[in-house]
Amino acid sequence: MSTFRIAVLVSGTGTNLQAILDRLHGQGGIEVACVASNKPGARALERARDAGIETAVFERAAHSDRQARDAALGDWLAEREVDLVVLAGYMELLSPGFVQRFRDRIVNVHPALLPSFPGLDAVGQALAHGVRVTGVTVHLVDEGVDSGPIVLQRAVEVPLDRGRAALEQEIHRVEHELLSEAIRLIAAEAVRTDPENARIVHVESQVETRHG
């Protein structure tokens, strides 16, 4: 069986990338084929290079506009024959053309229980609204902001003292687990879109990896 090849897009330190490398890379037929960033100084690129993974930088300033940059990124990913594009702390919206090109093959992890608190600073939004429970969502990416079909979610209780640091630490821990779990399910062909409702995906929970 063929290897399931994933590309990871990053902007920051790469803790979610590191979790993918530790939990999935080279296991069960899953391979991190390449890592790309919109930030040349991203620590995540160092993590990828340390693991012997090909990297590239696609800055918006190096292209005429976002669409041109995303077209170049898409060509680079297509040349590497990736099966899935994973947004792991990639802090920029993808252009509609890129999303259409990789339709249902892009996943993102978001630190809230969508559709609540989309966009930036989801933890701050949750604290400002006084919620007692927030969480983590892994979803397919569409043309909107954190609006794609939900693959997996997990709740996280907000500390009674409203401490942001403790909440962020727990959310990061859950992000690492949930994103890896979602990738494993997608690689096992256990996630499928609903032909009658584009908002819904169906997930088989008990599966074995079908690649490798």
What function would you assign to each model-found segment?
Residues 1-43, 47:
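N-terminal Rossmann-like dinucleotide-binding module
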Residues 23, 88-203:
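Donor/substrate-binding cores of folate-linked one-carbon enzymes
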Residues 33, 83, 104:
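Conserved acidic residues
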Residues 37-38, 61-62, 66, 80-96:
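N-terminal glycine-rich "phosphate-gripper" loop used for MgATP/nucleotide binding
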